[in-house]
Design a protein with these regions (language model features):
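Extended recognition/assembly regions associated with phosphoester-bond processing machinery
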Residues: 1-47, 51-245
């Protein structure tokens, strides 16, 4: 089964550039994106973090997002919009409107949760992507910006940030492998600075466990596509299928 998806990131809705609002630019981008959705009818739209520019976005920025989701759903009702929190976002804020998002076939993964066994809730991070007939054509492994307080302290494998990041990737990929069938794709969406990624002047530095850049070795070869956010430049990182939008 084939899966069609759009990979976007770093919208930074509500951003001001030297005290000038970028709302008009965002309006033009979202209008263009709606045209692409209408024309191509993807199975999923991925937003790989930094949806908003600040943790507490203005009401106008939130309205811009929710109006876009409503318009996108009207043009492609079958399309799922999958979002993760970036370092500019409040993960809890983007998750708390889940009932509203569900109306527009959208889902946000903002934080790493614990399950009833006080372990990492992998179910929350593993999202099926469906086709028009509601068949699962892919799984999206959704990893928001990883804050040390959310990923450490689960067990002996998560005593520090670097170990916790490796453990989280291993556990999530193993769970995805167990669920997927031969004709289903695996897409990993993450908001992170990867080693080998080319930066620009517009990103805010992010530091995890005193080591900012992560290794692409975290991504198992079974992953078909890695949809990255954070670096504001479309690029491949090492492999053809590991990309920033």
């Amino acid at each position: 089964m084939a899966v069609r998806f759009f990979h976007t990131s770093d919208w930074h809705l509500g951003q001001f550039f030297y005290n000038h609002s970028r709302q008009y630019e965002h309006e033009q981008f979202l209008a263009w994106l709606l045209e692409q959705i209408s024309a191509r009818q993807p199975n999923a739209l991925l937003i790989a973090g930094d949806i908003f520019d600040v943790i507490n976005p203005a009401s106008s920025a939130q309205k811009q997002l929710y109006q876009f989701l409503a318009d996108a759903h009207a043009r492609a009702p079958h399309m799922q919009t999958l979002m993760i929190a970036g370092n500019h976002d409040s993960g809890y804020r983007i998750e708390q409107v889940e009932p509203l998002l569900a109306k527009y076939n959208a889902k946000a993964v903002g934080v790493i949760h614990k399950n009833s066994q006080q372990q990492i809730d992998l179910e929350h991070l593993l999202v099926p992507i469906l086709d028009e007939q509601q068949n699962t054509v892919a799984w999206c492994l959704s990893l928001p910006f990883l804050r040390p307080a959310e990923i450490t302290g689960f067990n002996e494998h998560t005593t520090n940030s670097q170990n916790a990041i490796a453990y989280l990737h291993q556990q999530l990929i193993a769970e995805a492998k167990a669920r997927k069938t031969a004709d289903q794709a695996l897409i990993l969406m993450s908001h992170a600075h990867m080693q080998g990624g080319e930066t620009s002047d517009s990103e805010r530095p992010i530091v995890i466990g005193n080591e900012e850049a992560l290794s692409t070795a975290l991504f198992d070869e079974i992953i078909d596509y890695v949809a990255l956010g954070h670096l504001h430049k479309p690029q491949k990182v090492g492999e053809e299928h590991i990309r920033y939008s």
